[in-house]
Amino acid sequence: WGGSPDAIKTSIAEGRNGVMPPLVAAVGSADDVRNVAHYVLSLSGAAHDASKAALGKPKFAVCSVCHGAEGKGNQQLGAPDLTDRIWLHGSGIDAIVEVITKGRDNRMPAHKEFLGDAKVHLLAGYVLGLSKEPSAPKPTLGK
């Protein structure tokens, strides 16, 4: 939950739990689901159809039970922040519609007992490094 060194370390050590049931029945029709998907995209400032997002906003109340009224998420429930432009399952309309329609089961087991503190620390450093821009190659002197 988050990209800080401590957050990465906690995710590796303690695991993560994020289960979202299919919500199509609660949201409504296929058009309602697509409108909610446009609203979800609007929360992160991503490209979306503003008129469809406006229609989806009231239906987002179903989603707000876990994601919050502003879409900021709830770590205890495993509901991700929808405002941060971090998309684990694709950021397009079709990917979001699929998540609303089919749900998701995103569980990561805890690894602290298996790896131990030192290896969790090293793995967290490695994962953090994956999110950093690669440094420019150092110039080498000619022969």
Language model features with spans:
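Sequence/structural segment immediately N-terminal to covalent heme-attachment motifs in c-type
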Residues: 48-73, 84, 97, 101-102, ...
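Extracytoplasmic electron-transfer domains, predominantly the class I c-type cytochrome c fold
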Residues: 1-45, 74-132
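Extended amphipathic alpha-helical coiled-coil/heptad-repeat regions
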Residues: 134-138
